[in-house]
Amino acid sequence: MKIHGICLVKNESDILRYFLRESARWCDRIYIYDNGSTDGTWELACEIARESPRVIPFKQEGKPFRDHLRGEVFRRYRDDAVEGDWWCRLDADEVYIDDPPAFLARVPRSCHVVWSAHLQYMLTEKDLPRFRPEDEVKAPEATVETLPRHYIANASEARFFRHRNRLRWDETSWPTHMGLVSPERIRVKHLQYRSPAQIARRLSTRHTAAQRGYLHFEHETQQSWREKIADSSGLHFDAGDGRYVVDPAQLPNHLEPRWVRAMKRVMHGCGFWA
């Protein structure tokens, strides 16, 4: 079993080195599609690729952001995958807590899709004293020592799907008939807010994407990085001891309705769908 990671990235140079180092521990191939970075992300990815054979720069192209752009990577490299492999939506601001190869190995054969339990890490008022004035202009490189420590587990998204030779991925966010969702979720740290300059750049990038027609950044309408600073009293603290608080009641439901799951079992089981 191999894992193929599709990394659609834009302006993540501060965390890219850390992210690729962590992801290369378990992801067999990391395909980088740069969506028009202006902060050196693409150049850094190419530099790292010369040192790490698992990192494969696909291309840099600044077309309007859409989730279906990941399908371009899938279509380009799908022949390198075999039945039993997995594909991962591999975002540059995410680091996995659970070991993906071990986790995926125990997913029931009847299931094809794995969703995440997203631990959303925030900058809080307790982080602000460590930042210098220049950190509002240029994002410092993210390291395990400087990453935010406060989080709440309240989000969930699809992250992995099984490769099948008949899968099709056209102009959609995910492949057609991607499959049945596994009940168990894999835990991932979502390190989306890391420093004042990085937050400001993130907001600007998403404002531009929204202006160019992307409809799913409604949670990123703030104008200042200071509006993203969270109150630590409402969050859990990551003490670095490997213990995390994940309350299933705070996560959105990720499973299909029963009738949909039953239909998927029949259609995939009989081979009508890939």
Each PLM stretch: what is its role?
Residues 68-74, 97-274:
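Catalytic-site signature of metal-activated, phosphate-bearing donor transferases
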Residues 50-68:
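Conserved donor nucleotide-binding strand/loop of the catalytic core
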Residues 83-97:
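Short beta-strand-to-loop acidic/aromatic patch adjacent to the donor-nucleotide binding site
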Residues 34-47, 62-65, 91-92:
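A conserved acidic beta->alpha catalytic loop
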Residues 12-28:
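Short, well-formed alpha-helical segments that are part of the catalytic scaffolds
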Residues 1-7, 23, 29-33, 188:
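Hydrophobic targeting segments
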